[in-house]
Amino acid sequence: MNTSRKNPIGIYEKALPKQSSWLEKLAIAKAAGFDFVEMSVDETDERLARLDWTMEQRLEIVAAIQKTGVRIPTMCLSGHRRFPFGSHDEKTRQMARELMLKAIKLAQDLGIRTIQLAGYDVYYEEQDAQTIARFEEGMKWISEIAAASQVMCAVEIMDTPFMNSITKWQALADKIRSPWFQVYPDVGNLTAWGNDVENELTKGIENIVAIHLKDTYAVTETCKGQFRDVPFGEGCVDFVELFKLLKRLNYRGTFLIEMWTEKADEPLVEIINARHWIEDKMRQAGWNNA
C-alpha cells in the first residue's frame, strides 16, 4: 500500500479484468497507481462462493497481498440484495445471517478491515413495516457480531430511497449505538437523490470510514437517475466542491474509485484515466494528496 498518499486511493475489483487471478489483479492495480483493491462479494453464485474458499485459497490471496504490497482492506458485500435481512421468507433471512458470518470470517482471514453493507431492507420484494423492522434487527445483530470479531461494518448510501442519505443512516445508528456500525457513503448516490451534500457529509464526518467515488445522473421528476457506468464529469457530482468540503472537514480516510470495466477492451487504460481525472479535481480543490 502506498502510504505516501495522505488519503489512499483504491480501485474496485469490478474495474479490473474479470478473468485475472488475484495476484494479477493486485499487480495491475499497483501498476495503475492505486494503493488498494476493494473486493466484491455480490449476489452472483460465482462471487458468493468466495465465502466458502478453502484455507489454501485464502492463503493464496494473503501471499498475493504480501508479494505485491497491495492490500484488500475493504469488502463490498452486496450479496444481501439477493438474501436480505428484511425478507418475508425465514429461510432467506437465515441465509442473510450465514452470509454475514462467513463474510466476517473471510475478512479476518484476509486482513479486510471494513465490510460495506448494502442498505436494502428488501430489494426484490415489497417493502412494509415488517421488512424494515427485520432489517433493523439484522443490523443490530451485525453490530454485535462485528464488535466481537473486531471487523468494522459500514452501510452504503444506496441507489434506492430507503437508505439514500447519511441522515437516514444516522436515524438507524442512533438505535443501534455501536462504534462497529458506521457509514460508507457513495458520493454519486448521495448526490443523485438531491441531498444537501455539504450538510450530509458534515453531519456524518465522524462516522465516515471510507468514501466511494463515482458519477451519477440525478433523480428528477422526469428521470429515474442512473447509478452506474456514468463517465466521470458527465454526471451530477461536483467533484471540485466535494474535495474542497472534505479538505475543510479534514477527512483522512480512503477513496475508492468505483467502476465496472472488468469486461472493457482496455480496463487498465480506463482506470488510469479515471485516477488522473480524480487527482486533477483534487488539485483544483487545493488538495495536496502527496
Locate the predicted segments by residue.
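Active-site-proximal loop/turn and secondary-structure-junction residues that shape catalytic pockets
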Residues: A15-P17, V41-E43, G79-R81, G119-Y123, ...
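Short glycine-enriched, charge-decorated loop/helix-capping segments at active-site entrances
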Residues: L48-D52, D89-R93, Q226-F232
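A short acidic, helix-capping loop that chelates divalent metal ions and anchors anionic groups
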Residues: T44-A49, R81-S87, D121-D128, A192-G194, ...
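N-terminal small/glycine-rich loop or linker at the start of catalytic domains
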Residues: N2-Y12, T74-G86, G119-Y123, K224
